[in-house]
Design a protein with these regions (language model features):
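Structural signature of extracellular appendage/secretion-system components
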Residues: 1-365
């Protein structure tokens, strides 16, 4: 509504019978369909206390910060995604696909994290994007990414704020870059990786790849050895995720299965890695949505996913049927008291026509 300078429907306001905001077919369709495209990243994942050193103040603080971030993500999900059956279905299915893809690729290409104070460089001297940029003490509560979007920092309690971002941050939209304190890089773990059966003993060949995106950037480490840094940018320099619409079977692996790293460095079959691939189907994967705390394996997750939306669809179908029956019943009652019967009206028209004709003949005579 341009004249009122407001939206016709407020996205963040839930439909409520008490507020009389649950009426209208168009509004119902918009809520069910949603107004955006979502993927697995909108599904919040609760932090696991086992991943933090809860015996130290630093560990407890880090866990609390992670949980606070999870609470914010959960609120967003419950407000904008969960009310839409289509959006929540999209996010849930993408989470399942991403979980399987990343787990299989992670076994074939085991990785480790390196934290350093200076970035790795390409052969041309350009900086290789890190997996995480760490800012420990910034005097601004809000910074900006390269698209001009606001990024809120974590209050350190001393007037400064800390940030952990997947890309560099800036003081203002289009402004100067903030000095990075440390860089975190994901890289292929050469101590744990498998090797291909080809002549080159290829490493780092994933089974599922992203469109227009290589998994690794090959460069040289500080000790002069070749390292493989995780690459998260596609050919157009945008972030590339393992999600629906951006996945394909790795052509390199499909055309030459010998490059799939399922052998040891001695050229023997890597039975331990093969067993690990088999065992992932029995691992606890994730919960279906943020309101469910119990985790399921992949098959149970899929069954729960199908069951939840089948039940929801059946309930909505029955609800629509009941509402239609009720409306038809009220309409029939209205017609009985105030409506017009076409047969009755036709009978009256014929009667009056015959009476008119008879009266006309009488006058003529």
């Amino acid at each position: 509504w341009p004249s009122y300078e407001r939206d016709v429907y407020e996205d963040g306001k839930l439909a409520s019978n008490a507020d009389d905001t649950d009426k209208g077919q168009l509004k119902g369709l918009i809520i069910a369909r949603g107004n955006m495209v979502v993927d697995y990243t909108v599904v919040p994942v609760a932090p696991d206390s086992n991943d933090y050193d809860m015996s130290t103040e630093e560990g407890r603080t880090a866990y609390q910060q992670a949980y606070n971030e999870y609470a914010k993500q959960q609120e967003y999900y419950n407000t904008y995604v969960e009310p839409s059956a289509i959006l929540s279905a999209m996010a849930g299915f993408d989470k399942l696909v991403n979980g399987i893809v990343e787990r299989i690729n992670g076994i074939l290409c085991p990785e480790k994290t390196e934290t350093r104070t200076n970035p790795y460089l390409n052969a041309d001297g350009s900086e290789i994007q890190a997996d995480t940029y760490i800012y420990n003490s910034v005097d601004k509560a809000v910074l900006y990414d390269r698209y001009g979007r606001e990024v809120t920092g974590t209050d350190n309690g001393d007037g400064t704020y800390s940030y952990a971002s997947g890309e560099k941050l800036y003081e203002s939209a289009g402004g100067a870059a903030v000095t990075v304190d440390s860089y975190e890089y994901l890289m292929l773990d050469m101590d744990k990786t498998g090797y291909g059966m080809d002549d080159n003993k290829t490493v780092g060949t994933e089974l599922f790849s992203r469109i227009g995106t290589d998994r690794y950037i090959k460069t040289t480490g500080d000790n002069g050895e070749t390292i493989y840094l995780r690459n998260n940018l596609n050919e157009t320099d945008y972030e590339s995720l393992y999600k629906l619409g951006n996945l394909k079977i790795n052509p390199e692996a499909a055309q030459n299965v010998g490059k799939i790293p399922l052998s040891t460095v001695q050229g023997k079959e890597d039975f331990d890695r093969a067993k690990e691939l088999v065992d992932i189907w029995d691992e606890k994967f994730a919960s279906l949505n943020p309101d469910m705390y119990a985790k399921s394996d992949y098959m149970s997750f899929y069954n729960n996913y199908i069951g939840e939306y089948a039940t929801m669809g059946k309930a909505l179908y029955n609800y629509v049927g009941n509402q239609t029956t009720m409306v038809d019943g009220y309409d029939n009652q209205r017609l009985q008291s105030e409506g017009v019967s076409s047969d009755e009206e036709l009978e009256k028209m014929i009667k009056y026509q015959q009476a008119y004709n008879a009266a006309s003949r009488y006058v003529n005579v």
